[in-house]
Every structure is written in structure tokens, then in C-alpha cells.
Swiss-Prot record:
One of its GO terms (biological process) is dauer larval development. Coiled coil: none annotated. It comes from Caenorhabditis elegans. InterPro entries: Insulin-like_regulatory, Insulin-like_sf, Insulin_CS, Nem_insulin-like_b-type. One of its GO terms (cellular component) is extracellular region. PROSITE patterns: INSULIN. It comes from the Eukaryota. Residues 1-18 form the signal peptide. One of its GO terms (molecular function) is hormone activity. Keywords: Disulfide bond, Secreted, Signal. Belongs to the insulin family. Disulfide bonds join 54-83, 66-96, 70-97, 82-87. This is Putative insulin-like peptide beta-type 6.
Amino acid sequence: MHSIVALMLIGTILPIAALHQKHQGFILSSSDSTGNQPMDAISRADRHTNYRSCALRLIPHVWSVCGDACQPQNGIDVAQKCCSTDCSSDYIKEICCPFD
């Protein structure tokens, strides 16, 4: 009876331990066979934070250009566009400022 329980536990523990080692190796390795950096996945939150801070800095700029909050034409995401590339004041006027 005890040997059956021991075999069942070993059959359960070994795959879990192997999976745990594989996961730890991914996190701790500096690069994989394709040259990708696994640690870069951890920095994705930083890119999101940078995007969010860019969007927050963009709000006062839009207010200074339009005199009001952005009212994007055609559903354009102004923060996505202007945080990935530089946007001119003319571009912001074109897509954000309400038509007179």
C-alpha cells in the first residue's frame, strides 16, 4: 500500500519539478537559442508606464493647442499616435480641435 502511494507521489512531483526548473531557467537565462532576451518580458510594464506618462504630458499640450479637451475625429487614438512619433501642433489641431 505504501509503495503505491509513493509511486503516485513520485509520478506527480517529478513533472511539477521539471516544469518548475524549466520556468526558472527561462527567467534566469540571459538569452534563448533565438537570441531573444527573456528578461525583456519583465520590462513591458515599464513601456506601459512610459506610454501612460506620455499621455498625461500630452493633455496640457492639446489644451494649449485647442483651448479645450481633445475631440478626436474618426476615432483616432491621439496618445498612441503622438507618443510613438512626434506630432506637430498642426497635426493635433487637425485631429483634435473641434471644427468651427
